[in-house]
Amino acid sequence: MGKLQLRLLKHTDRVELDHYLRLYSRSFNPDERVSTQILRWVIQPSPARVNPVHLFAAYSDKQLVGGACTLVLPMFQVVFGSYIFVAPALRGRGLGAKILREVLRQERKGVHGWNWRLYGEVTASSGDGWHKLLARAGFRFFKKMWPLASYQHPNRIVPGRLCYFNFRRPPERFSQPALLTYIHALFYGPETMHRHLLPRLKHFVKLEA
């Protein structure tokens, strides 16, 4: 395949966005994918939206081969990498690693690149190979289970692992417990966060950096 190109989509890129969201939907099981309606909504510019969402489309020879979705959290100087995906028919060719490297490069270019960090989640459906690839790329994993709530069945918990990558150095005055409770409540709702994350939060308090 040709050289990989990663493009940041805008809400006005209607055709490209339609193709992206169809591939995104095919790449994740219902428990782990947020609805495409929500993704369409959150990439629309709004003065009230303080946490920008980046939808990156990955192309090779003008063919859409995968993508990524990140959430930028200026309050915590963090980028949260919610999704990286490759077209099912093209997996096993190293495209996931190329997309990951390009996401890190592009997020590092921004004004936040000096001292921000990027977080990511993995689950059993990510595959052991993806876990190992992230570790080789420089991501560090927390030892304890990270509880992801199912988007299809809110009372179901999907066991995951949380990891992070430092762009340069840790942010100043960084509060990891506040960040993780905020992210969990944002993604899954306050009730789920109180029920499933707070009892485990002590395992994520110590900054492993």
What are these regions (language model features)?
Residues 45-50, 105-115:
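Alpha-helix termini
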Residues 19-23, 98, 102, 129:
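Alpha-helical elements of Rossmann-like donor-binding domains used by nucleotide-donor carbohydrate transfer enzymes
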Residues 57, 63-72, 78-85:
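Conserved beta-strand in the GNAT
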Residues 54-56, 77-79, 157-163:
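Short beta-strand micro-motifs in enzyme catalytic cores
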Residues 86, 92-108:
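Conserved acetyl-CoA-binding loop-helix of GNAT-fold acetyltransferases
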Residues 44-57, 66, 156-157:
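A short helix-loop-beta-strand connector motif used in the catalytic cores of GNAT acetyltransferases and
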Residues 2, 9, 109-209:
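Terminal substrate-recognition subdomain of acyl/acetyltransferases
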Residues 1-43, 57-59:
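Short amphipathic alpha-helix that is part of the acyltransferase structural core
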